[in-house]
Amino acid sequence: MNNARPIRRALISVSDKTGIVEFAQALAERGVDILSTGGTARLLAEQGIAVTEVSDYTGFPEMMDGRVKTLHPKVHGGVLGRRGQDDDVMAKHGINPIDMVVVNLYPFAETVAKDGCTLADAVENIDIGGPTMVRSAAKNHKDVTIVVNASDYDRVIAEMDANDKSLTLETRFDLAIAAFEHTAAYDGMIANYFGTMVPSYGENKEGDEESKFPRTFNQQFEKKQDMRYGENSHQAAAFYVEANPQEASVSTARQIQGKALSYNNIADTDAALECVKEFNEPACVIVKHANPCGVALGKDILEAYNRAYQTDPTSAFGGIIAFNQELDAETASAIVERQFVEVIIAPSVSAEAIEVVAAKKNVRLLECGEWTTKTTGFDVKRVNGGLLVQDRDQGMVSLDDLKVVSKRQPTEEELKDALFCWKVAKYVKSNAIVYAKGDMTIGVGAGQMSRVYSAKIAGIKAADEGLEVAGSVMASDAFFPFRDGIDAAAEAGIKCVIQPGGSMRDDEVIAAADEHGMAMIFTGMRHFRH
């Protein structure tokens, strides 16, 4: 059975008018009668396109400052009417079939994002007629085409030309899915906005922590790719991204070459990229299993890479490498000649570097673009039956925030290294201990159940690679509950410790630092990472 449906009459009413004149002109040239409303109708008429105002078609004027335009049986009957089943009742009431609906919705998200947006402003940008038409057309996709995205205009015209001015059921169904996704995202935005207003009607309590989190959590993600498997080979997986993801992220990165990114590749690349963003100087971060195993700064990214690699060459094998400056040919050569690597990501990649990496065709080479702002938004963790939602950890400290609690004052170099390894510790799984000296990690102890063992592991790692711990700084993502971690660090040769403080036994821990002649710095900020 032929499931194609000819397009003879279209209703067009759009807020985003990108490409709409050209699309309407193309429809008119193919003999399609056009109904339209308000500003869209005026725009089309001004461009010489024959258009019938919906109010002229229904015999009922727009009213209430445009709140009521298309909410009429002659409109929705024409959209919802089932061809071959409702023809008699449509004819009885003078309802003409509408074969295509072209609608996008009032710019609610853009409105509420503006400074000074009031509840009244938001309310007036809640579209009523638009979603109703979209859902009506999508529901009746067996007979009606719904178009909500300007990116589909060319596709629709091309299929009409190839199919005697008709569209297939497969296309109508695909467009209907896009329509339901569109209205779901729209309603989710409205629910989120209003959900932050409670309990005080009309008052978005800026700065009130509770007001950040709506009563229901509505976010929409688009599937970017299906994967061979997930974290393990027996788990099915796919990668979803936000409709408008932030700049310079693993979600927006362009893959220049290499095999498809795996589930673990994406998770590890995200960890590496977000860590390297912390630094302004040329920096390299090497990640394995979501933990930094080597981080360093340098006069250029080649030096930064060489120093980061020295921290833990064993763990760097099969790792993810991130840079905060353009990948050049010399650095690319150093990587591919020295080690097996899964992913390399940088803001940009030179043409010469692309040629170098091409010799290793399986290496995934990504270009993420420059970043100008900190990553914002929510951090979301799935638990059985629920979500944990929090602000992203953007907390950092400066020299002015540091409190020296030991008898010995840290040297200028120790202060510099303290801030460096404090940034790194933020990205290491708790319990996290980082040893660093000269803007280079010396040892990393990650993910241990006791902090003292993380400290011991950092020392063991450094010793295994022949790196000198003496004179290094130690960062801890949380306070030391006992002095044993300080004793272990002193035994390894640590001379300065940076940590949040806040333990019931801070006095005991500080006393241990004084006994060992260490400098100890409190940040007053914790960086748990689970």
From Swiss-Prot:
> What keywords appear on the UniProt entry?
Hydrolase, Multifunctional enzyme, Purine biosynthesis, Transferase
Q: Name one GO molecular function term.
A: IMP cyclohydrolase activity
Q: Which domain of life is it from?
A: Bacteria
Annotated MGS-like domain residues: 1-148
Q: Which InterPro entries match?
A: AICAR_Tfase_dup_dom_sf, Cytidine_deaminase-like, MGS-like_dom, MGS-like_dom_sf, PurH-like
Q: Which SUPFAM superfamilies does the record cross-reference, listed alphabetically?
A: Cytidine deaminase-like (SSF53927), Methylglyoxal synthase-like (SSF52335)
Entries under PANTHER family matching the protein: BIFUNCTIONAL PURINE BIOSYNTHESIS PROTEIN ATIC, BIFUNCTIONAL PURINE BIOSYNTHESIS PROTEIN PURH
**Know the name of this protein?**
Bifunctional purine biosynthesis protein PurH
Which gene is annotated as encoding this protein in its UniProt record?
purH
